[in-house]
Amino acid sequence: MTIPDLRGKQVLITGAGSGIGRAAALAFAQCGAHIIASDIQLAPLEAVKKEVEALGVACLIHAVDVANEAAMKEYADRVHAQVGAVDVLINNAGIAYLGLFLHSDLDHWPRLMNVNLMGVVHGCRHFIPKMIAAGGPRRVLNVASSAGNYPAPSMAAYAASKYAVAGFSEVLKMELAQTQVGITTVCPGIINTAIVTTGAGVAPSVPASQIAKLQAYYVAKGCTPEVVAADMVRAVQKGQDICLTGPGATLVYHLKRLSLKLVRMATIATAKRIGYL
C-alpha cells in the first residue's frame, strides 16, 4: 500500500518530543500532513507544535505513557474522536540502557521492555482496528533498530526489545496482508541522538570515559534524525516493508544474512573500538 500524496493525511507519532520523533513530525508536516504528536512529557511537544504549525498544517499534542495500556486506549479514543482513523501510525517512543549484562542490575529491564516493545503493541492494538475499518491505504511504522539485526554488546535489554519489535512487526504484516493497512519495520543505524546516554540510563559500572568515547563515535559516524525522518516519509510513499536508514543499517542487515560469523567479528571489533566492550 503506497501513499504517494501525504497532503491532508493524519500522521500520529509517539515519542515526538525530540530526536527521530520530532524530525518525523516536521518531515511529514513538510509534505502537507497533519500531525498528532505524543510524548511522556507535554513541554517538549509545545515547541514541536509551533514548528509544525509554522509549516501550515495542524498539530495536536498529547502527553501519554506508551507503556500504560489504559492510557494508550484513552489516548486512541481521544484521537479518534478528534480526527477519526489515522492514516499513518508511527510507533517511535523508545528508551535505552547501556551496560554489560552481567555488570548491570535487572531493574531497568521491565520499564525498557514496557516502553520499547509494549508501547508498540499498545499503539498497534488501539489504533489499527479503526485504520482497517476506515479503508486504505494506510500504514504503520514500527521503529525497531539495527540493534535488532545484530548482537550489540552492552545493550542487551535494548537489543532484545528491538529484536522483539522486528519479530512482532513481521507477524503483524502477515496477519494484515488481506487489509489495506501496511506495516513497515524501521531499522535506524548509527543516529546522533541522546537516546543511549539519556534515554533511560547507564549502568554504574560504565566509566565516564566509555560514555565520552561512545558519544564521540556517534557524533563522528552518526547521521542526524532528519535523515531517518526523510527515509520514513519515503517508506510510506513507496509502501516499503522495511526501512533501513542511517550509517551501517543496510550493511548489517545484509551481512547477517550472508554470514553470522562475519557479523560477530565486525561487531566485536567495533564494540572494542567505541567502548561497548
Which positions does each model-derived feature cover?
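The beta1-alpha1 cofactor-binding region of Rossmann-like NAD(H)/NADP(H)-dependent oxidoreductases
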Residues: 42-43, 63-74, 106
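Conserved glycine-rich cofactor-binding loop
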Residues: 10, 17-19
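Conserved glycine-rich Rossmann-like NAD(P)H-binding loop of the short-chain dehydrogenase/reductase
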Residues: 31-47
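SDR active-site lid
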Residues: 178-247
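Residue(s) in the substrate-gating loop at a strand-loop-helix junction
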Residues: 145
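Active-site helix of classical SDR
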Residues: 124, 161
